[in-house]
Amino acid sequence: MSSKWTLEACFSYVFAVLMFIGMHYFQHNQGGSGLELPFNLVVWCFTSLLIGLGLLKVSHSQRLRYNRSLLVMLFSTILLWLPLLYPNAEFGEFAIDRLLGLSAGILIIFSIMQLELSRQHWHHILYFILAGVLIESIYALVQLYLLTQGNWVGFNVNATRAAGIFQQPNVLGTFVLFGLLASAWLISEKAVRSKLQQIIVFGCCFFAAWAAIVSGSRTVLIALFALLPLLFPYLKNSAEPHLLRGWLICIALGCLAPALPELLNDGVARDAIGGETTAYRVTMLKVSWELFKQQPFMGWGYGAYDGIYHNAQAAFNAQGLIKGYHFNVAHPHNEIAYWAVEGGLLPLLTLLFLAGYFIYSIFKQTWTKACFHLGLLFPCLLHTMTELPFYHSAIVWLLFCFFVSKIATEAEGLCTKPFPAKFAPKVFAGLIPLFTILFMLTGLQTIHHISTFERTGSSDVSLLEGIINPLPMLSRYEFDAMTFRLNAASKLHLSDELKNYLSWSDSLMRRKTRTENYYNRIQAFKALGLTKQAEQTYQQALFIYPDTERVSFRYIFAMRTGEKALQAYLIWNKQQLKDKPDAALYIHQINGLVLLGRIDEALRVQQQASQRLPNELKLRNIPSLKPYTEPMGSS
């Protein structure tokens, strides 16, 4: 094989296409995480090719390259699969996707270690990372400052935070920090020589810092200002002084840049730091801790977190034990808490052991190099303690695995062992990309069909019937299909079909607590004439989704039931507000009035609410009223 087309060179080329094009793929979707987001499916297509190249290298060289860190990670991954065998893992199938993603990450690290990537190859990879970050940073700034109403990507121009392709501002913030990390690595290895390279590095630092600030993520801000002191001691000893100064100056200018558009727009600021989320995170952690204490040894079962959380939260809220009520919680926004609640002590101790060993291994180097390596991983590690970046973004997970592989190799070196099996690695090198790409491309078709189905009134069932591979969105696919059958059965009075829906929803309600699940179940009971069961379900939904919270089942039920029900709700709502003012009740009333087209009344209620509750910022910034309160032509 010519030097131009070595496996290492092909690895760089595939990675380059991913960072320049693949990761930025856009397709309309209905939100979510993991494989529900189209760009993640495309990233996994490229990732499978990268894994395949690593396995092909094993076949060609007939050698295995590894170190102790890789063995520890492999052993830890096996341990994390074991709770699937627990007797309480009723919903374990819904944890398989994250276990497969974790295992794929180990395969990525393994594949990178097999390839004999030279310093030049690694520098190219870092520059490709800079390119990807630069593209996303500029795209995020375009979203925030240049896009107009009705843009084809569907970005809400009233939003105060940019999200890039990720549809989640905090994930954008963590991703763009990779630009600062990659540039720091480049200048530490004196790989920034030409003027063009300096322009790329400094330009990326400037725009990445700007995008990080406008992402409005407190986690990202903490990570940004914590990683600098971690990186600086090693950079001071290894980087050329003028490059280090330029690096720091560009980051500082990027952090200051968001103030410039505000100064040019007569001081009209766009507040990037959005609503109060600290109380929500504290609540999730507090509820998770209580759940862990109740089942510390075997946990509540993989895949069960969503169902058990909301009932526990409602019970604690009724007792006045928590502040900050949260909804649609499928993850506690803390990775350790997630595994501990679902799997108990084994996953918890495994993760702590893995983290402890890795920190121990890198601190066998000089303290400046160890702090530098820790700083390279710090933004992602911090983010996993406050949210779920690896679930929202496959590219963040991939880059994290890249960094782990390189750091582990620098800290411990690599051992080489003969591996005479030549055929098996070559077969898997072909099969893994083949099946992954087929799965992900049919997944993109699934996303398109389900998005079209839901956006066009959920009435054209042929869209669901035309889906080839429902697995990437299996829960949503099943819900849409069963809801369509429920609606048809209600109209045609098909009692057997209605009972079939209730039987199916029994398991769903224990696994996933959502307002739409309660609503459908109530409709099924009513259609069967089971008014007592319908009322019991309604009361349970009110318990899970109280009236004075952001998500109120009473309001949602009225909104879905029809105009008369909504008008009756507004009468009830006003009566409640006479006795005690409440921000959430006011917001529900205003949103209901907007839905009914009573805009002037909604504006009066907002003014009244702001006077009665002057410290409630949410009352001054209600999204449904923005089109009627902002000046013409503003964005």
Q: Locations of the language-model features?
A:
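Transmembrane signal-anchor hairpin modules in multi-pass inner-membrane enzymes, especially those
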Residues: 1-82, 92-94, 107-123, 127, ...
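Transmembrane alpha-helices of multi-pass inner-membrane enzymes
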Residues: 45-48, 228, 369-423
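Short aromatic-rich membrane-water interface segments that cap or initiate transmembrane helices
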Residues: 31-34, 88-100, 158-172, 285, ...
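Membrane-interface catalytic loops of GT-C/OST-like multi-pass glycosylation enzymes that act
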Residues: 32-36, 92-97, 166-169, 215-219, ...
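Interfacial juxtamembrane loops and adjacent helix segments
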Residues: 148-161, 275-279, 290-294, 302-342
